[in-house]
Amino acid sequence: MLISISLATLPILAFSWASFIEPNWLRTTAIPWRLPKKHAHLHGLRIAQISDLHFHKRVPEKFLNKVSKSIKNFSPDLIVFCGDLLCRARLEDKERLETFLNTLEAPLGVFAILGNHDYSSYISRNTKGEITCIPEEKSRPIQRAIIAVMQGLFSSPSYRYDPNLTPQEPHPDLLKLLKNTPLTLLHNTTHVIPNTLNIVGLGDLFARQFHPEQAFKNYDPSLPGLLLSHNPDGITRLQQYPGDFVLSGHSHGPQVTLSWPKFARKFFERLSGLENPYLARGYFVTKEGKQLYVNRGLGGLKRIRFCSPPEICYITCSYD
């Protein structure tokens, strides 16, 4: 009898944890960035990476304060945001969002790129599995989620675009808001910090705005390169370009996952919708030597997380 009651309460406890505890359980990850000795002057440079805020009215103020306090305590030289400030291309409660963004300060600057939620339309997969604009009235999130599960298990993970999808423009109201904050938007461009490093910001893959041939025009090959690509699949399209460390988000970990057993982890990775599902979270090094860190992000379409708490990544440079 007691065993039956215990088993019956497990789903309730798991749902409560995933809905109310873990989405607010902010974690930090420390990553070293080892540079050649010729860049020894960058030893100790500190970078904070955040991603996927998906800001909306229901994001708790207490959580935003946690993020701000953690970053302030780390005292970074540089802050980067890897896309998806907005949720479904909606700018809600913009005064509160602006207030939060104005808490992000760093001596070398705060830089941001756009994600698939940050353009004039929300871009994701439709019920046919094609990447396209998703009108709010036709969002059908439950139906699309079920179809995504089926496609993730039985279909090729390669991206299929709606043939009518044209390159999307950045969200105009978001651009206006960013001008009132410390954030510098990098959209297919490179910002060179003299005698320090290149920061390359790519447009989003889903938005058909990923243009590295344009982004690297101003790149200084004598300096290390930090590359910002919202979608981690971007790294497969960057191998012929310079740069040492790629920072991404997009997949959220995924938000609900299991790290064990292995087949369960593989199952949830497929549900991330990536072309390369193994890139759903964590640190990687390509055979060409590029490093990649995929951040689990801060938020999501729904504030539900299980075995994938929200994250800030702290990177410290050193030399070999």
Swiss-Prot record:
Pathway: Glycolipid biosynthesis; lipid IV(A) biosynthesis. The chain crosses the membrane at residues 1-21. It is a single-pass membrane protein. Its cofactor is Mn(2+). One of its GO terms (molecular function) is metal ion binding. Its EC number is 3.6.1.-. A divalent metal cation 1 binds at residues 52, 54, 84, 252. A divalent metal cation 2 binds at residues 84, 116, 250. It is found in: Cell inner membrane. One of its GO terms (biological process) is lipid A biosynthetic process. Pfam families: Metallophos (PF00149). Binds 2 divalent metal cations. Its main location: membrane. Keywords: Cell inner membrane, Cell membrane, Hydrolase, Manganese, Membrane, Metal-binding, Transmembrane, Transmembrane helix. It catalyses: UDP-2,3-diacyl-alpha-D-glucosamine + H2O = 2,3-diacyl-alpha-D-glucosaminyl 1-phosphate + UMP + 2 H(+). GO terms for cellular component: plasma membrane. Belongs to the metallophosphoesterase superfamily. Hydrolyzes the pyrophosphate bond of UDP-2,3-diacylglucosamine to form 2,3-diacylglucosamine 1-phosphate (lipid X) and UMP by catalyzing the attack of water at the alpha-P atom. Involved in the biosynthesis of lipid A, a phosphorylated glycolipid that anchors the lipooligosaccharide (LOS) to the outer membrane of the cell. This is UDP-2,3-diacylglucosamine pyrophosphatase LpxG. The lineage of its organism: Bacteria, Pseudomonadati, Chlamydiota, Chlamydiia, Chlamydiales. The gene is lpxG.
